[in-house]
């Protein structure tokens, strides 16, 4: 009877097609676990965020104190806050690995799924940015001031745009209140887009490591991949709890333990680690507007990847030349992340500029050209 309910009930039928009887390629590897891990991350962040919002006060005179109150006086408030703060880092680790897998195995050729994924990344970054402002520490305040000020680079409307976002002539109470509203709202928008992301994915079915049609060799999602995902859940929760309980401030900034002071600028303003690669690209261009456009393009360049696919093969698994350049891109992104956390002085400026040029060159010129060369080598036989 249970089988019939699962397959006949209008609501359960949708769940069944998405989670139980979903046909999945039999050879998908560990790299296909990150989609479900991102779903788990999103649920953890929404739940912990909801409990934090119950005790947080979005007011410049009380925001910092309310976070201290959560950590000291609320039952397990310190744990909820540590899980929420470190959960964001884990979220971005999973996102970057998910994107890397998509780039390596050619999953970007499912254009609708991929483009919605890029929009999801942009929304996730926006959510993390406005969330980082909420504790109202020094780095929160100055990070908000510096990043929002970048919008003034746009001609004609720039200054008006900045003041409109600030709700005044500086980052103040109006800014904090609206950032809290955005931080509360955006995760639910991410949740809605995630459903659309999955709808498009289930239209085409999952890609696989070989990058070939796997219709002849599909197995049901449950129990095979549901248990495989469950292992990933346990591993991720282990890492998250280890980070939250033993090293909760490892990925944070010490400056944020100081209440926001508009009269004292921190010696080195930098965002959270997961934005450092884009921040390094922003800083590597001397022109303000050019830097802002490069910052945006560093993320939206992912939308061009399907258009720049010149190879006759989908996956990188049998393409040694493209593999080399893919791993160079990974190394380059790590170098950019390191540079973004360093002060603006030599040799970091030059290294950042070289890494930024390499980042865009690999996407726009080198990898498409490598694919074209591989096609030529294949046609020799």
Swiss-Prot record:
Query: Could you share any additional remarks the record makes about this protein?
Result: Heme 1 (or BL or b562) is low-potential and absorbs at about 562 nm, and heme 2 (or BH or b566) is high-potential and absorbs at about 566 nm.
What terms describe the molecular function in GO for this protein? metal ion binding; ubiquinol-cytochrome-c reductase activity
| Compartment(s) of residence | Mitochondrion inner membrane
Quaternary data: The cytochrome bc1 complex contains 3 respiratory subunits (MT-CYB, CYC1 and UQCRFS1), 2 core proteins (UQCRC1 and UQCRC2) and probably 6 low-molecular weight proteins.
Q: What does this protein do?
A: Component of the ubiquinol-cytochrome c reductase complex (complex III or cytochrome b-c1 complex) that is part of the mitochondrial respiratory chain. The b-c1 complex mediates electron transfer from ubiquinol to cytochrome c. Contributes to the generation of a proton gradient across the mitochondrial membrane that is then used for ATP synthesis.
Q: Superkingdom, according to UniProt?
A: Eukaryota
Gene field: mt-cyb
Cofactor binding description: Binds 2 heme b groups non-covalently.
Q: Name the family the entry cites.
A: Belongs to the cytochrome b family.
What residues does heme b b562 bind to? 84, 183
| InterPro entries the record matches | Cyt_b/b6_C, Cyt_b/b6_C_sf, Cyt_b/b6_N, Cytb/b6-like_sf, Cytochrome_b, Cytochrome_b_C_euk/bac, Cytochrome_b_N_euk/bac, Di-haem_cyt_TM
User: What is its membrane topology?
Assistant: Multi-pass membrane protein
Q: List the disulfide bonds.
A: none
A GO cellular component annotated for this chain's UniProt record is: mitochondrial inner membrane
Q: Give the protein name, as stated in the record.
A: Cytochrome b
- Extract the Pfam families matched here: Cytochrom_B_C, Cytochrome_B
Which positions bind a ubiquinone? 202
Q: Which Gene3D superfamilies match?
A: Cytochrome Bc1 Complex, Chain C (1.20.810.10)
Which keywords does this Swiss-Prot/TrEMBL entry list? Electron transport, Heme, Iron, Membrane, Metal-binding, Mitochondrion, Mitochondrion inner membrane, Respiratory chain, Transmembrane, Transmembrane helix, Transport, Ubiquinone
Q: Which SUPFAM superfamilies match?
A: a domain/subunit of cytochrome bc1 complex (Ubiquinol-cytochrome c reductase) (SSF81648), Transmembrane di-heme cytochromes (SSF81342)
Q: Where are the transmembrane segments?
A: 34-54, 78-99, 114-134, 179-199, 227-247, 289-309, 321-341, 348-368
Q: Which residues bind heme b b566?
A: 98, 197
State the needed cofactors, names only. Answer: heme b
